[in-house]
Curated annotation (Swiss-Prot):
<keyword id="KW-0067">ATP-binding</keyword>
<dbReference type="Pfam" id="PF03746">
    <property type="entry name" value="LamB_YcsF"/>
</dbReference>
<keyword id="KW-0547">Nucleotide-binding</keyword>
<protein>
    <recommendedName>
        <fullName>5-oxoprolinase subunit A</fullName>
        <ecNumber>3.5.2.9</ecNumber>
    </recommendedName>
</protein>
<dbReference type="GO" id="GO:0017168">
    <property type="term" value="F:5-oxoprolinase (ATP-hydrolyzing) activity"/>
</dbReference>
<dbReference type="GO" id="GO:0005975">
    <property type="term" value="P:carbohydrate metabolic process"/>
</dbReference>
<dbReference type="GO" id="GO:0005524">
    <property type="term" value="F:ATP binding"/>
</dbReference>
<dbReference type="InterPro" id="IPR011330">
    <property type="entry name" value="Glyco_hydro/deAcase_b/a-brl"/>
</dbReference>
<comment type="subunit">
    <text>Forms a complex composed of PxpA, PxpB and PxpC.</text>
</comment>
<keyword id="KW-0378">Hydrolase</keyword>
<dbReference type="InterPro" id="IPR005501">
    <property type="entry name" value="LamB/YcsF/PxpA-like"/>
</dbReference>
<comment type="function">
    <text>Catalyzes the cleavage of 5-oxoproline to form L-glutamate coupled to the hydrolysis of ATP to ADP and inorganic phosphate.</text>
</comment>
<comment type="similarity">
    <text>Belongs to the LamB/PxpA family.</text>
</comment>
């Protein structure tokens, strides 16, 4: 039996500012990356998102970020590893509190935005994230980019490192994401994306931007829900996996 997780970023409204269609996303995914207040979300949004996840039977993960609410966590923060570890631990603890009140717990951790991209190569910040997860306890899995410094650090620390793929992103022949500055970086055709993700789940390969075949090891697929048409694409990917007989289930 082939099993694949679908994850998405949720809980990103802040105060009167809305973002994404979490209700639609929850109908499609098995794991929810809940913003913890540092790049998006607030205590009330976090609490309601956890309640909605419980109602939908979706696993809750902590979507931790640099302390960059104004920039939506998309800007690098040149902080010390100790400060970063403290920030990540703080975010995990905050989400765990509201998750428990909602009847669930934090089951995994996924870095967001600039933090996610930085710890692909930044050894010190990668280790800081791992240290925070270890300090939190429970040896939670980390959802990370294959081949990243963070993935190696997590495995070295005895944590489960779960590699993920991105449904709507193009890949280079080397198996890395095409830069958003280059053609083919973002895919918009839902049928094409669905076909690619079914193929990935079945045989672990994708067609790279140059037409070659590239092997991608992924235990989870990220489907975005915060851009126009993205929730519908997530639903189509889920339906395609279901039709192919692939079991969609959280890794955590």
């Amino acid at each position: 039996m082939t099993v694949m997780d679908l994850n998405s970023d949720v809980g990103e409204p802040f105060g009167a500012w809305g973002m994404g269609d979490d209700a639609a996303v929850f109908r499609s995914v098995s794991s929810a990356n809940v913003a913890c207040g540092f790049h998006a979300g607030d205590p009330s949004v976090m609490a309601q998102t956890c309640r909605d996840a419980v109602a939908a039977g979706v696993t809750v993960g902590a979507h931790v970020a640099y302390r960059d609410l104004a920039g939506f966590g998309r800007r690098f923060l040149d902080c010390s590893p100790t400060e970063l570890a403290d920030d990540v631990l703080y975010q995990m603890g905050a989400l765990e509190a509201v998750a428990r009140a909602a009847g669930t717990t934090v089951r995994y951790v996924k870095p967001h935005g600039a933090l996610y991209n930085t710890i692909v190569h930044h050894e010190a910040h990668a280790q800081a994230v791992v240290n925070a997860v270890k300090a939190f306890g429970g040896d939670l899995p980390l959802l990370l980019l294959p081949g990243s410094a963070a993935l190696r650090a997590a495995e070295k620390a005895g944590l489960r490192a779960v590699p993920e793929a991105f449904a709507d992103r193009g890949y280079t022949p080397e198996g890395t994401l095409v830069s958003r500055r280059d053609p083919g970086a973002v895919l918009h055709d839902a049928a094409q994306v669905t076909e690619r993700m079914v193929r990935l789940a079945e045989d672990g390969t994708l067609t790279a931007v140059d037409g070659s075949t590239v092997r991608i090891h992924a235990e989870s697929i990220c489907v975005h829900g915060d851009t126009p048409g993205a929730a519908a694409m997530a639903a189509e990917v889920r339906a395609g996996l279901d039709r192919a007989g692939i079991t969609v289930r959280s890794f955590a």
